Amino acid sequence: LGSSLVGSLYILDEPSIGLHSRDTDRLIHVLKELQALGNTVVVVEHDEEIMRAADYLIDVGPDAGRLGGEIVFEGKVSDIKRIEGDINDKNNAESKQLLEKYPRSYTIKYLTGAEFIEVPKSRRPWNMAIELKGARMNNLKGVDVKFPLNVFTVVTGVSGSGKSSLVKGILYPALKRHLDEVADTPGEYSSLGGDWKQIKHVEFV
């Protein structure tokens, strides 16, 4: 993408997969630079930041499989405005009209804020955890970390920081072997302790 070609059509298929928000910003900057040089950029994507940075949006749906395959929205991203307060307020007239015109577009519903993912009012407490110590693989520098049991945990960080090495490269195969299951050789680690015996099976999806 760093080339200076002009008059080209660049097609990218979900380039944001695996990217941290910081890296997504950098990707958007590169795509904008390509466009500024006189190129056409077409991106297959569902990342909100990239959709909002685009000039034009084509939404395919309304659902997956045999329930999809139709264009449920096509238009300028600048026409998609977030709802502020009551949807019936005059300030939200454009958003209301857009929702009425394209009722089958889930993308428009979320970009306008008509639908949203609610943040839980409370978090599930935990008192058991798997403790991984001295994890060393690729960019990991002998880290110690706890993975709480019976809760929803997210491992995050910028691209290349060591997330996959920690989870896929060490935790997963190490735990499989502790459970006497066949697994690849894990990355280096000092110990796997805590309440790992509470785990009966390990699945990598």
Report each predicted region and the residues it spans.
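Conserved phosphate-binding elements of NTP-dependent enzyme cores
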Residues: 1-205
